[in-house]
């Protein structure tokens, strides 16, 4: 008897919640869908090796060089930041900025180092909650017209130990 009463009470409590649940908004969906567009980029290129990414640098130096190229590219109206073929670049977190297309060319490897100090605290979300956390490998905040392209390899640097 008590089990049956409990079930009826739970049903009575849950019914209003179902009625109040947010329904699918087809108009909102269409509005979001229509706002999506192909990013636009200026026809300029920035080769990361021209900004200090030498083939024998540390992860911190590669990170600074890559970020310098990204920052300059965005500041000058956007374009393509190129990670050149034939090299492996060990780096820390990279923050994309508006107007930047990060192209990892075929034969290039962009590998993220397991060095926590190379991943600054950034504003992010986790399971829908706004929070501050260590930066992901590639991060962008309030940026428009960004992309990662190319046939190269992006290696998150994960292992059985991380």
Spans of features found by a protein language model:
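Extracellular "leader-to-stem" segments immediately downstream of a signal peptide or signal-anchor
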Residues: 2-7, 12, 19-101, 105-162
């Amino acid at each position: 008897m008590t089990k049956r009463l409990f079930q009826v009470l739970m049903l009575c409590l849950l019914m209003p919640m179902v009625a109040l649940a947010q329904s699918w908004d087809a108009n909102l969906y269409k509005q979001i869908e229509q706002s999506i567009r192909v990013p636009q980029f200026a026809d300029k290129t920035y080769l990361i090796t021209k900004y200090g990414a030498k083939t024998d640098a540390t992860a911190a130096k590669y990170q600074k060089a890559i970020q310098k190229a990204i920052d300059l590219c965005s500041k000058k109206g956007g374009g393509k930041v190129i990670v050149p073929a034939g090299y492996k670049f060990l780096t820390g977190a990279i923050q994309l900025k508006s107007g930047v297309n990060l192209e990892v060319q075929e034969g290039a490897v962009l590998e993220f180092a397991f060095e926590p100090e190379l991943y600054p605290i950034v504003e992010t979300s986790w399971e829908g909650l706004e929070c501050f956390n260590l930066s992901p490998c590639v991060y962008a905040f309030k940026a428009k017209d960004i992309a990662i392209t190319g046939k190269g390899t992006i290696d998150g640097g994960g292992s059985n130990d991380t």
